């Protein structure tokens, strides 16, 4: 759904809205076989243990809203339920800055939680190398409390990798939640988000972590915006769920996500995104009418901007 349509309300009655989701080059991000020579060499270069049973990947900036400490806490809760031998065959890779002022000191967080199977990759990788990194992973995790889209999830899907993610912002668009009729959900002014889990049926490639706390934050330029937070305990349960699936099942659901991302319904490829932009631009030129040189407005016609939906939905 186009968020502009919800925000504008009656002011958007005579406007045309088109939803164009993010798309990526599916020739750069793609599924590789386990014996692919480049993938094997990349694993050696990263010094990844050859006997790993479970490799979880986080890929984003070290900034506060990405909630990396919550991810590490969830990992701690998850690995505490494993035996010492099982722990040795699990790894969480954080592809991000180790220490960054807009975020935090991640080595200190890792030390605080006492987890030995978390590593940080803070050097730059090419797009081709990033695709290799996704292909080393059994799953991707992104628990942001505010996220416009979450490109790491799209990259994961195109590489055939399932993901664990917070149900907020555009990340829920990539989970394919279904409505009562089995259709990909279209949000409206009554139900603008599924962050609290009204709808539970979703694509198998997604392991959603529903929001436990929504607060209101803001600034003078943006007076109010929702700040969604997950419970790390629930995130740890999704990690355990993905872990217990085994490699064959993880590969199966990852393939389902890849097929959906490549298909016409989702269209998360750069080619499909470009075609939608072309179609929308053509429609604009066909329907566009020049604005009047001037308009008269009554400054007494002030309409208050009031919450358009129930707080609990």
Regions found by a protein language model. Name each.
Residues 162-165, 175-176, 182-189:
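Short hydrophobic beta-strand element within catalytic cores of glycosyltransferases
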Residues 103-128:
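Nucleotide-activated donor-binding/catalytic signature segment of Leloir-type glycosyltransferases, i.e.
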Residues 145:
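Aromatic "clamp/platform" in nucleotide-sugar-dependent glycosyltransferases that forms part
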Residues 48-66, 72-75, 92:
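Conserved donor-binding/catalytic core segment of Leloir-type glycosyltransferases
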Residues 1-19, 24-32, 105-108:
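A short, active-site helix/loop in glycosyltransferases that binds the activated sugar's phosphate group
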Residues 30-49:
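A short helix/loop element that forms part of the nucleotide-sugar donor recognition site in Leloir-type
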Residues 132-137:
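Short alpha-helical donor nucleotide-sugar binding micro-motif in glycosyltransferases
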Residues 200-313:
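C-terminal amphipathic helix plus adjacent low-complexity
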């Amino acid at each position: 759904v186009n968020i502009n349509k919800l925000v504008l309300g009656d002011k958007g009655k005579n406007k045309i809205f088109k939803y164009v989701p993010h798309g990526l080059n599916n020739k750069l991000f793609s599924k590789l076989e386990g014996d692919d020579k480049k993938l094997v060499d990349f694993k050696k270069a990263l010094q990844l243990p050859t006997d790993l049973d479970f490799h979880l990947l986080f890929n984003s900036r070290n900034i506060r809203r990405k909630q990396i400490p919550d991810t590490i806490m969830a990992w701690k809760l998850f690995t505490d339920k494993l035996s010492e031998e099982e722990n040795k065959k699990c790894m969480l890779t954080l592809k991000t800055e180790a220490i960054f002022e807009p975020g935090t000191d991640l080595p200190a967080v890792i030390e605080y939680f006492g987890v030995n199977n978390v590593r940080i990759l803070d050097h730059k990788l090419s797009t081709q190398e990033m695709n290799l990194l996704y292909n080393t992973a059994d799953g991707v995790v992104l628990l942001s409390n505010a996220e416009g889209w979450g490109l790491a999830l799209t990259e994961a899907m195109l590489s055939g990798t399932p993901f664990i993610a917070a149900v907020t912002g555009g990340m829920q668009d990539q989970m394919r939640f279904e409505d009562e009729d089995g259709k990909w959900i279209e949000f409206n002014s009554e139900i603008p988000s599924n962050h609290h889990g009204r709808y539970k049926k979703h694509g198998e490639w997604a392991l959603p972590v529903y929001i436990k706390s929504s607060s209101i934050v803001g600034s003078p330029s943006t007076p109010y915006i929702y700040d969604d937070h997950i419970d790390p305990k629930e995130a740890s349960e999704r990690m355990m769920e993905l872990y217990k699936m085994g490699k064959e099942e993880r590969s199966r659901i990852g393939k389902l996500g890849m097929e959906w991302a490549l298909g016409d319904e989702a269209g998360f490829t750069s080619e499909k995104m470009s075609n939608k932009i072309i179609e929308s631009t053509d429609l604009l030129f066909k329907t566009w009418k020049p604005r009047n040189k001037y308009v008269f407005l009554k400054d007494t016609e002030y309409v208050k901007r009031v919450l358009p939906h129930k707080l609990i939905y």
